[in-house]
Amino acid sequence: MNRGKLPEGWATAPVSTVTTLIRGVTYKKEQALNYLQDDYLPIIRANNIQNGKFDTTDLVFVPKNLVKESQKISPEDIVIAMSSGSKSVVGKSAHQRLPFECSFGAFCGALRPEKFISPNYIAHFTKSSFYRNKISSLSAGANINNIKPASFDLINIPIPSLAEQKIIAEKLDTLLAQVDSTKARLEQIPQILKRFRQAVLAAAVSGTLTTALRNSHSLIGWHSTNLGALIVDSCNGLAKRQGLNGNEITILRLADFKDAQRIIGNERKIKLDSKEENKYSLENDDILVIRVNGSADLAGRFIEYKSNGDIEGFCDHFIRLRLDSNKIMSRFLTYIANEGEGRFYLRNSLSTSAGQNTINQTSIKGLSFLLPPLKEQAEIVRRVEQLFAYADTIEKQVNNALTRVNSLTQSILAKAFRGELTAQWRAENPDLISGKNSAAALLEKIKAERAVSGGKKTSRKKA
């Protein structure tokens, strides 16, 4: 922040000039409780600082006699995470009026603004990328990143007049609240789209999606069946992890898929002899069922295999199903198996041992459902994919909008601390930014008051 680029009436000063750093309460582990009792005070720790506010759901409590009066959080304080194993945590801040008496631990500190400095202005400054980047560069430690009190001597903050500080803080309160509201609404959309996709699949497998095609609400041509009647061949995957003879074949693992979509680039290849190659080779539209997984949400899920033209096999974490293509489409089967009643049946068919969830071929073949004619299956698949493509387009637009919104906060903060949000206000209020109201005069007042009190910087030492 170059002094030559400052607006009229502004100045720059180290953060330590316009605030006093209060160090946190030191206590032993055995002195802390996880519940409140008489003569104890709640303690804010670094993990309680979230998104500029205090998360008070996981507080510890220490005896009041360990807490000095100066260490109690005041409404003006900006509490800072002073020490953390993560650079993304160290330096983060919270400024919030608490409804109860509270203090903060030794891994935190509080910036207490001077008399002529707006606490809200300082709080917004600690959200800026300029501040965060400076903190990141100044924090040091082998395993733990620490901010030293002297670090605040090295972080300069642009200072306008007190009146302008308050105007800037008010504008930021309004603008950033609007950004947060927009972000919150955008973040809800993926869940809405998830429910939309689930509703589409429910309509697909119940026949609702193709009522108009049948010209009837009755499921004409649909019949009850089980999966075993539609399977031509089933096989557990290859157990060995290496081979000595034969052709080198890609053996697919669960790591080669994400959300049932193929990931290219990190496949494992194993040499298979001709007998093994014949047994474990995949064909287009085969179904791979996740046979075993630590997650019950993943075990038993169906993945439609699409051939890339190469011979590929599959490992023993999968069961391969080869379907009768004259009776059922593989894509339609994934709709049946991965949502609703089909998924409920398969999940309840899992057996659990040593933290692993497993499903067997017998349980898979026992999956029962209503099967429409092949022509109607094709129409269902077409409509589902069309609706899913629509949802995917919306989701992509939402993600792009979220990226822009996330950058908007820093853009607004940067404009604020360059004086761009208050240019018109300064033009309309020259008396409030000049002479005795200028930032330079304000800093002189702070300097004079500190001289009289013996220098408040000494308060930065461990309280």
Swiss-Prot record:
Keywords for the protein's UniProt record, in alphabetical order: DNA-binding, Restriction system
InterPro entries from the UniProt entry: Restrct_endonuc_typeI_TRD, Restrct_endonuc_typeI_TRD_sf, Type-I_RE_S_subunit
GO biological processes: DNA restriction-modification system
Single GO term (MF): DNA binding
Subunit text: The type I restriction/modification system is composed of three polypeptides R, M and S; the restriction enzyme has stoichiometry R(2)M(2)S(1) while the methyltransferase is M(2)S(1).
Domain notes: Contains two DNA recognition domains, each specifying recognition of one of the two defined components of the target sequence. The recognition domains can be exchanged between different S proteins, generating enzymes that have new sequence specificities.
Functional summary from the UniProt entry: The specificity (S) subunit of a type I restriction enzyme; this subunit dictates DNA sequence specificity. In the presence of the R subunit the complex can also act as an endonuclease, binding to the same target sequence but cutting the DNA some distance from this site. Whether the DNA is cut or modified depends on the methylation state of the target sequence. When the target site is unmodified, the DNA is cut.
Recorded family membership: Belongs to the type-I restriction system S methylase family.
Note, other: Type I restriction and modification enzymes are complex, multifunctional systems which require ATP, S-adenosyl methionine and Mg(2+) as cofactors and, in addition to their endonucleolytic and methylase activities, are potent DNA-dependent ATPases.
Name of the protein described by the UniProt record: Type I restriction enzyme StySPI specificity subunit
Origin species: Salmonella potsdam
Gene: hsdS
